[in-house]
Structures are given as C-alpha cells and as structure tokens.
Amino acid sequence: MMPSRSTLEPTPAITGLVNLFATHSLVALGEVHGSQDEADFITALLHHPAFPAAVQIIVVEFGNALYQPVMDRFIAGETIAARDLRPVWRDFFGWGFDAPIYEQFFRTVRAINRTLPLAQRLRVLLGDPPFDWSQITQAVDLNSMMEKRDLHYASLVETHILAPGYHGLLIAGLGHFIREWAAPDAPDVHNTVQRLERNHPGSVHIIFPHIGFGAETSALEPYLAGWPIPSLVSLRSTWLGELDAALHFGNFQPPGVEPPPLKQGFTLGHMADSYLYLGPRSSLTRSTYNPAIYRGDELLHSELQRRHSLVAPPGYVLDLLTEGDPRLFPD
C-alpha cells in the first residue's frame, strides 16, 4: 500500500525550525556537504528576524578550531586579510571545504551581526578539533584527530551552549547526527548527538534534508509533490518516518552497489526527528570549486592534493582543475 498524502503536514521550514527552539536547546541540522540548496536555506534562516532572538551560538563542522580566535575577530566585525581567514575552512580534515558556500556562510553571519545589538550578536564555534596540517605527514598522524572529532564538537556544545543555558544551531554531516547506529554490528563509539543525549536527554532535535529515497525515489517522491519549498515535516508517527532507513543510505551508494546491511526494522524515524524538503532529488544543486583558484596557485593545489592522498579512499581522484557538475546527484 502506498502512503497517504494526508498523513503528512509540512510547515514552512524557516519558521518551523526557529519554533523548535521553544522546546529544545539544540537543533541539529544534518548537512549534505556541498549542497547549494541547503546553504541557501541556511542563509535565509540566518536572515529571519526571529533567528537571533532564538539562537545565540552556531556550531559548524566546516572549520578548524585552531583558528577560533581569527573567526571570533572576523564575526565581530574586525577586518581580516583573506590569507588569514581562508585556513578556517581550507584546513579542515581532508582537503577542506573550499566550495563558495562555506566562506559565504561566515560572511553572512558577520554581515548580520553588524545589524544587531551587541547582546544579540551570533557567535560561530568551529567544530573540528584544532590541528596543524604542516605537522601531518602520513595517514597515521590523523588517527588521533579522527577519534576526537565528535568528542570535540560535543564538548563545545556542552561548555558553550548547554552549561550557560543558551540555544544553539548545530551544522555537520549527517553521520555526526544520526540518533542510533544503523548497522547491526555498530562499534561501541558515539557520534556527536549520541554523546550529547547521553548526558542531556531530550536536548536535541535532529533534522535531515531530503536527498531521495534510493531505489524508490521515483515511486515515493510524487507524494511530496506540491509541498512548499522549503518545508519541514515531523518524522514522528508518519509514513515518512516509518520508511526503511536503507532507502536513505542507498542515496550514497555507487550504481549497482547495495547499501550496507542495517538493523532489522531500522527507520528514518530512528535517525532523526524532522525532514527538510528542499525540492526533488533531481533539482538539487552543488556549490562547486572554482578551478581558477587552483590553476593560479600551484602551491595550494599541491598541498590540497597531498592532504587528499592521506585521507581519501584508494582510487578516489580529487580533480580541482576541472569545473564540477552543478547537479548534487548527477545520476
């Protein structure tokens, strides 16, 4: 039996998200890295007049905490040279978040702060652990940092948001915010949300964006047709929340490759609380690297390739000199 359209009641996503802070200290927005549509949604959210009154701190994955003093000065309005600012996102684990949307996020917060009274200005905390790429020469050097990523992020949230009684918007990749591990043989580790809820149960509301339904996308997406863009809908007690979570994980598999085995009965509702609809999968777009940056800076290009070689799966090629596909999912 196909789902009934009447069982879902999407609400305007921006006001819906802001209203969540009336009942939760934290809203965790899972980010699809490079998504232009999600970045545009975040920009519109930041500009909503009710947002600064509801939120005091934003914690982002796409920033190296080594540069937190630089970011604090920049967000406060101080002039920072581009060469000093760009390492914030470029020196992230891996080869950096150098797509334009990440720099634009920080500049948007800075611009909004200029319009706000001092007491209402937003603070941005850089969620990745502080580390210096010049000290990383082999893959094993990254192991200790990898183990600290979720711990560092969660510790920031506990210290700077929960302890003083503030409200915070958390932005990071989906894996950091999954409420339960999906694999039947999941390791005894804890991601960011699991760490937070262990000590602060009920403090986090998790939102995952729509990226399709794997092999069932063409069958299920028509049931979302007509929704306003952007929309937010609860996953609790709805057919959407009861969908097999494998349909979500299947979105990341190469053609012909089956998604990993999951726990029996594991659903979208086990992973998150709400679902953010930004349009059908085929309409979603990507913020792409600018090849001209790397063609004109051989040292930067070589360094990013070096970092990539230390963290990427075998056979994965980083091509920074060719303009990328503007579609988020080219399939």
Where are these regions (language model features)?
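Compositional signal for N-terminal targeting/processing segments
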Residues: 1-331
